[in-house]
Amino acid sequence: MRIKLTSLMVDDQSKALRFYTDVLGFTKKHDIPVGEYRWITVTGEGRDDLELALEPNSNPAGKAFQEAMFAQSIPIAAFEVGDIQAEFRRLTAHGVAFTREPMPAGPVTLAVFSDTCGNLIQLYQPN
């Protein structure tokens, strides 16, 4: 058994696709119209086998969960990077709002930013 796909709820699929591709650097894999929404997935660098779906957050329970996680400063996902300081500088230069600057946390150094679509995302670099 392996993980092939996971989802993030987003408040605007077009804005999310731009952010995850143009700012974070992921690659669009699928963008298929499905009724009033779209099936959008992106992949990370060198990881065509693992997809992140940018799901429309139209479910009231999903919205409540997303808002509660954001309000409590809890990241909804974590992405590993090779050089967290370089990524912090690069993303800050692109206007990304960090809620936590890089800091050591045991076996990793981590930082947290807003994805502009209702989620907090953690970046981490193994120490």
Please annotate each region the language model reported.
Residues 1-5, 27-80, 86-114, 124-127:
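Vicinal oxygen chelate
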Residues 16-21, 91, 118:
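Conserved active-site tyrosine of GNAT-family acetyltransferases
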